[in-house]
Amino acid sequence: MSGRGKGGKGLGKGGAKRHRKVLRDNIQGITKPAIRRLARRGGVKRISGLIYEEIRGVLKVFLENIIKDSVTYTEHARRKTVTAMDIVYSLKRQGRTLYGFGG
């Protein structure tokens, strides 16, 4: 093993990536029809055109808060993988208890 720790053969520990995809405007991946479907599931009949950007902004803030908390739980447990329970605990901490995913 030659002192590489838990990582095994050291695969995936290479240098800097030459071509790294720049992540921006991913929130636009939440398409207008997807937002419309979610609204329909919630019982909405008609949707104003100004709603879509507003929903994207609110959703982005909500997910950032959940992910930030989840990563905090993961780092505290000295893990590198975010588990479903990290998400459940993050949601519970923010007052949105989710059932059906263990715990």
From Swiss-Prot:
InterPro entries in the record: CENP-T/H4_C, Histone-fold, Histone_H4, Histone_H4_CS
Pfam families: CENP-T_C
MF term (GO), any: structural constituent of chromatin
Ranges for region Disordered: 1-20
UniProt DNA-binding region: 17-21
Highest taxon above the source species: Eukaryota
Cellular component GO terms, alphabetical: nucleosome; nucleus
Subcellular location: Nucleus; Chromosome
Annotated Gly residues bias: 1-14
Broad class of where this protein is predominantly found: nucleus
Job description of the protein: Core component of nucleosome. Nucleosomes wrap and compact DNA into chromatin, limiting DNA accessibility to the cellular machineries which require DNA as a template. Histones thereby play a central role in transcription regulation, DNA repair, DNA replication and chromosomal stability. DNA accessibility is regulated via a complex set of post-translational modifications of histones, also called histone code, and nucleosome remodeling.
Name of the protein: Histone H4
